């Protein structure tokens, strides 16, 4: 078994509300290097930890985390639509392994995924189908949330499973860092919004377009006095990156969900995917060497935008 890790932010506003050209050029260069790394590694399996943004998972049944044996992209925000090349039998085997190790993961045989999963696959592989993949979706936007220690434990068990494989495995985490887009909360929501959050699958093209326009509008004023959203917090982001660089993964056990939401934004909890990915790497091969490939707070994209890579020592 050989394993590598990439963790990176995603943003639905890429190409829709862009920052200055020099910032885009920086990000493009970083992603080009990451793609080259993936190409050279040529993974035989990708395990991706990703969030959902009320496109596949809703409050009618909201699991803290779910593994998919089949997945299809909804194609939101300029991402590719269509099926992912999910390794069904191996995903089932992984689900059984996780359950046998006392982590109560949910299972989906027909999961819809959104840009939170697919944008990173596109950016690193150019496709949704180039490599076999196992998606694991971690609830990161719909409170109440599982504590961070459970996310770390999930990653550890996935890493233990990966260690049994005779494959080149790429582990991906996608989301964060600090950010707060206009994602509604169920508590106190008007009836129509509450109904969407409970069972809003398969919206009309008009409804999806309206949702996209609201996000674009939020991006145009994000970080200014006109925005009601929690601003980006570069200090929090850098401290989180340092934690991963130093392999202090057990420190996340003390993370306060309420404090993170207040200090860095409610959607910052997408960093759970990074926690799971690094925990998987550490459990699969022990110590690791990590690299801060890029970080920049980008208001136009509503993202503390970061990229990290890691491999066993």
From Swiss-Prot:
Enzyme Commission number(s) from the entry: 1.13.11.16
For this chain's UniProt record, which GO biological process terms are given? 3-phenylpropionate catabolic process
What positions does UniProt annotate as the active site of this protein? Answer: 115, 179
> What does the record give as the reaction this protein catalyses?
3-(2,3-dihydroxyphenyl)propanoate + O2 = (2Z,4E)-2-hydroxy-6-oxonona-2,4-dienedioate + H(+); (2E)-3-(2,3-dihydroxyphenyl)prop-2-enoate + O2 = (2Z,4E,7E)-2-hydroxy-6-oxonona-2,4,7-trienedioate + H(+)
SUPFAM superfamilies annotated for this entry?
LigB-like
UniProt KW keywords: Aromatic hydrocarbons catabolism, Dioxygenase, Iron, Oxidoreductase
The EC category is oxidoreductase
Pathway of this protein?
Answer: Aromatic compound metabolism; 3-phenylpropanoate degradation
Cofactor names: Fe(2+)
Q: Which GO terms describe its molecular function?
A: 3-carboxyethylcatechol 2,3-dioxygenase activity; ferrous iron binding
Superkingdom assignment: Bacteria
Q: Name the NCBIfam families on file.
A: PRK13370.1-2, PRK13370.1-4
Q: Describe the protein's quaternary organization and the partners it interacts with.
A: Homotetramer.
The text of the family note is: Belongs to the LigB/MhpB extradiol dioxygenase family.
Q: What does this protein do?
A: Catalyzes the non-heme iron(II)-dependent oxidative cleavage of 2,3-dihydroxyphenylpropionic acid and 2,3-dihydroxicinnamic acid into 2-hydroxy-6-ketononadienedioate and 2-hydroxy-6-ketononatrienedioate, respectively.
Q: What is the name of this protein?
A: 2,3-dihydroxyphenylpropionate/2,3-dihydroxicinnamic acid 1,2-dioxygenase
Q: State the organism of origin.
A: Xanthobacter autotrophicus (strain ATCC BAA-1158 / Py2)
């Amino acid at each position: 078994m050989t394993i590598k890790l990439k963790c990176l932010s995603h943003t639905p506003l890429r190409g829709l509300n862009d920052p200055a050209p020099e910032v885009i050029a920086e990000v493009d260069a970083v992603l080009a290097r990451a793609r080259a790394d993936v190409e050279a590694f040529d993974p035989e399996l990708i395990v991706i930890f990703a969030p959902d943004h009320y496109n596949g998972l809703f409050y009618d049944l909201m699991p803290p985390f779910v593994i998919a044996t089949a997945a299809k992209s909804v194609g939101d925000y300029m991402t590719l639509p269509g099926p992912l090349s999910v390794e069904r039998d191996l995903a089932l085997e992984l689900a059984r392994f996780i359950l046998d190790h006392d982590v109560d993961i949910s299972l989906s045989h027909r999961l819809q995924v959104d840009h939170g999963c697919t944008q990173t696959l596109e950016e690193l592989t150019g496709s949704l189908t180039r490599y076999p993949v196992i998606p694991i979706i971690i609830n990161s936007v719909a409170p109440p949330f599982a504590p961070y220690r459970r996310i770390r434990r999930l990653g550890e068990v996935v890493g233990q499973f990966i260690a049994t494989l005779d494959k080149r495995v790429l582990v991906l985490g996608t989301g964060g860092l600090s950010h707060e887009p206009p994602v509604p909360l169920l508590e106190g929501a008007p009836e129509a919004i509450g109904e969407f959050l409970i069972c809003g699958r398969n919206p009309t093209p008009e409804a999806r377009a309206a949702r996209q326009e609201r996000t674009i509008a939020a991006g145009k004023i994000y970080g200014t006095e006109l925005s009601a959203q929690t601003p980006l917090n570069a200090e929090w982001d850098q401290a989180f990156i340092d934690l991963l660089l130093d392999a202090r993964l057990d420190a996340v056990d003390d993370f306060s969900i309420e404090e993170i939401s207040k200090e860095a934004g409610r959607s910052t909890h997408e960093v759970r995917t990074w926690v799971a990915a690094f925990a998987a790497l550490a459990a699969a091969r022990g110590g690791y060497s990590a690299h801060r490939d890029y970080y920049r707070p980008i208001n136009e994209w509503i993202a503390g935008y970061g990229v990290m890579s890691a491999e066993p020592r």
